[in-house]
Regions:
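Thiamine diphosphate
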Residues: 1-161
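Conserved small/polar residues in nucleotide/adenosyl-binding loops
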Residues: 162-166
Length: 166
């Protein structure tokens, strides 16, 4: 069984090989998001921001505003807590074409403590006009979703729940 996050990033890499406008942005999470192969194979389409989620969202908005198809990827808890204002203003209100991939929602990162829990992501993001939210149920649905998202012109939050199959 393939985990949703692996399906997501494998499909994104496959599409990015053919479309130079696809860019992956991450925040020191290439391991947890499984973006290692993407970074190695397409370094010109990969942006590593370090532990700076607010900056990653701002950079993603700027790239999208210039015509790129941006996927900003990392733990769900940090995109909905640490960078909430940037998601609201730079993505939802501004309708920038950025897809947020939030991995390990809920209490999936349980051992890392409450700072890594994401219990409010869907509730909070539902209040933002123009923000779309999707939770694919398995790898097959995730693959189909990525193919649709590449050409979908609005901001989308994709929540992938944790599974132990990398």
């Amino acid at each position: 069984m393939i985990a949703c996050r692996k399906s997501f990033t494998d499909t994104l890499l496959e599409l990015a090989r053919q479309d130079k406008d696809i860019v992956a942005v991450t925040t020191d999470a290439r391991g947890s998001v499984t973006l290692g192969d993407f970074a190695k194979e397409l370094p010109a389409q990969f942006v590593e921001c370090g532990i700076a989620e607010q900056d990653a969202v701002g950079i993603s908005a700027g790239l999208a505003h210039s015509g790129k198809k941006v996927f900003v990827c990392g733990p769900a808890c940090f995109y909905v807590a640490r960078s909430l204002e940037q998601v609201k203003v730079d993505l939802a209100y501004s309708q920038n074409n950025v897809k947020i991939l939030g991995v390990s929602g809920g209490v999936a990162y349980g051992a890392l403590g409450a700072t890594h829990h994401s219990l409010h992501d869907i509730a909070v993001l539902r209040t933002f006009p123009g923000m779309n939210i999707v939770l694919p149920c398995d790898a097959r649905q995730t693959r189909k979703l990525v193919k649709l998202l590449v050409d979908y012109p609005e901001p989308v939050y994709v929540c992938l729940l944790y599974t132990s199959d990398a």
